[in-house]
Amino acid sequence: MASRVLCACVRRLPAAFAPLPRLPTLALARPLSTTLCPEGIRRRPGALQSALALAQVPGTVTHLCRQYSDAPPLTLDGIKDRVLYVLKLYDKIDPEKLSVNSHFMKDLGLDSLDQVEIIMAMEDEFGFEIPDIDAEKLMCPQEIVDYIADKKDVYE
C-alpha cells in the first residue's frame, strides 16, 4: 500500500515543480470551489469579488488537489475483512487457524511482542494511533474490529 502511494507521488513530482502560468492565464481561470468562499464573506458588500479572485486557480494546478472524501465509508464487515486480511499477511499466523474469535496467545501461539506488531499493523491500516492502554486489551480480531468501529463511529 505504501509503495503504491509513494510511486504515485513520485510520478506526479515533475508536474508539481512545473512553472506556474503567467498572469494572463490566471485571468482566464475558473473558480475552484464555492467552499473557498464561506457564507459570511459572500454577504459582505465588495468582499465577493476579492474572495473570487483568491478562489481562482489555473486549470493545470487544479488536478494536483487531493480529494480526501474518495474513500468508501467504513462498515463492520469491511473493518472485519481488513483486520483479517492484515492478520493473514502476518508471517507468524497460520491462516487455517485464524478466525475472528481466535485468541492471539492461546489459539495462535503468539507472544506479547507479536501482539504489539499486530497493533502497529492495524494502526497503519486504519490510519490512527491506538494507545498502549487500549492495545493491551485487544487480544483477538473481534476485539480489534469492535475497537476500530467504536473509534471510527461505525455502527450497523
From Swiss-Prot:
Domain annotation Carrier: ranges: 77-152
GO biological process: [2Fe-2S] cluster assembly; aerobic respiration; fatty acid biosynthetic process; iron-sulfur cluster assembly; proton motive force-driven mitochondrial ATP synthesis
Protein encoded by which gene: Ndufab1
Disulfide bonds: none
Subcellular location: Mitochondrion
O-(pantetheine 4'-phosphoryl)serine: residues carrying this PTM: S112
GO molecular function: mitochondrial large ribosomal subunit binding; structural molecule activity
Family of the protein in this entry: Belongs to the acyl carrier protein (ACP) family.
Modification N6-acetyllysine, positions: K88
InterPro entries on file: ACP (IPR003231), ACP-like_sf (IPR036736), PP-bd_ACP (IPR009081), Ppantetheine_attach_site (IPR006162)
GO cellular component terms attached to this protein's record: iron-sulfur cluster assembly complex; mitochondrial [2Fe-2S] assembly complex; mitochondrial inner membrane; mitochondrion; nucleoplasm; respiratory chain complex I
Major site of localization recorded for this protein: mitochondrion
Name of the protein described by the UniProt record: Acyl carrier protein, mitochondrial
Function as written in the Swiss-Prot or TrEMBL entry: Carrier of the growing fatty acid chain in fatty acid biosynthesis. Accessory and non-catalytic subunit of the mitochondrial membrane respiratory chain NADH dehydrogenase (Complex I), which functions in the transfer of electrons from NADH to the respiratory chain. Accessory protein, of the core iron-sulfur cluster (ISC) assembly complex, that regulates, in association with LYRM4, the stability and the cysteine desulfurase activity of NFS1 and participates in the [2Fe-2S] clusters assembly on the scaffolding protein ISCU.
Complex formation: Mammalian complex I is composed of 45 different subunits. Interacts with ETFRF1. Identified in a complex composed of MALSU1, MIEF1 upstream open reading frame protein and NDUFAB1; within the trimeric complex, MIEF1 upstream open reading frame protein functions as a bridging scaffold that interacts with MALSU1 on one side, and with NDUFAB1 on the other side. The complex interacts with the mitochondrial large ribosomal subunit. Interacts with alpha-1-microglobulin chain; this interaction is required for the maintenance of mitochondrial redox homeostasis.
